[in-house]
Amino acid sequence: MHSHTPTISVIEPRGLPVRALAYYRREVDEPCETRVTHQVHDTVGRLCEQRDPRLFTLMRSGTAVPPNLRTFQSLSGQHLCSDSVDAGWQLNLPGAGGQMLESWDQRGWHRRTEHDPLLRPVAVFEHFAEEPERCAERITWGSSSPDDALHNRCGQSVRHDDPVGSRMLPQYGMTGMVLAEVRHFLDSLEPPDWPVTEAERDPLLEPGDGSRSVWHFAASGEALSQTDAKGHTRYFTHDRAGQLHDIRLQRAGLSSVETLVSAIEYTASGQVLQELAGNGMRTLSSYDPTDGQLLSLANQAPDYVFLQNLSYRYDPVGNITAITDAALPIQHFANQRVEPVRSFIYDTLYQLIEATGWESAKPSLGPELPEWQAFGPPDSSRWCNYSETYHY
């Protein structure tokens, strides 16, 4: 099916791609259908128009159709306007320093951003259709005061008032990592219109000390612990390469520490080979040494019984063609031989066109609740084959 279906690129004298030709075939005995993606560049070589095969065919037939995406840029290369057949148009107004000042879109949404002398955003105003303009966000930056310098806040965001509340960042690390965060939520469900001063913003928040999270990092940047707003603390241990080795949890008010995951091993390229969960479940993985593709994924219970043992097969371009679960037996039900194998077939554009596999004889589909079942293990022999086809 994939014979004589190359991908061809057409390059103009400036070295810019102007067309990409793909050949579509769904069945082996079908003739190939040429699909052309069209691109247009301006005088200086910037992409300004794009057409997919559908709109390119209409254009070639003489029908006046707009491109899928038309973009306009300034002399300095900044994005000014885009017009999409799907998302509509969007207009941007940048400042002389490259900062975004205002933007409009086809839905009637207007967004305006104010900046400080260092071109950092300090306030974001939003206006939709006939609604009055409101301040949706305000950002406060650390100064060069002794207190900000003591907590490494100079030049960092120390308070961010957003549509859901306020995020306080009282302390940073030497390399810029957040060491503490306090989140205050709005006292009302209505979208906020943040005042200028902090004294006027604080009454809009829920009373109390807020939700505080704290992090600790090693000198090389790895996270050592995290304490959440409920007082639960997670501890992280790393190996010599700085990769995560285990995670432990200490619940609030308890002195005992429980293991969530441990004994994490990696390949030379950083892929996880195995890990041991806190309940004794072990996850084992293997990869192709030539390209790093996942070859198998297994879950082993504490009694060394495999609950899942998946193996994967791929086509030459990396699409999954089959998944086999060796932990499940071959079943026979309703005059069918049901093997624990899922297979996938693709067209010449590598779009999924057929999928086969196995499922429960009474699958629970739709939003309604599943049927009532008597207490006890389900009947594992009531499986049947299924097949799905896809058209684009």
Locate predicted features.
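Beta-strand elements of repeat-based all-beta scaffolds
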Residues: 1-392
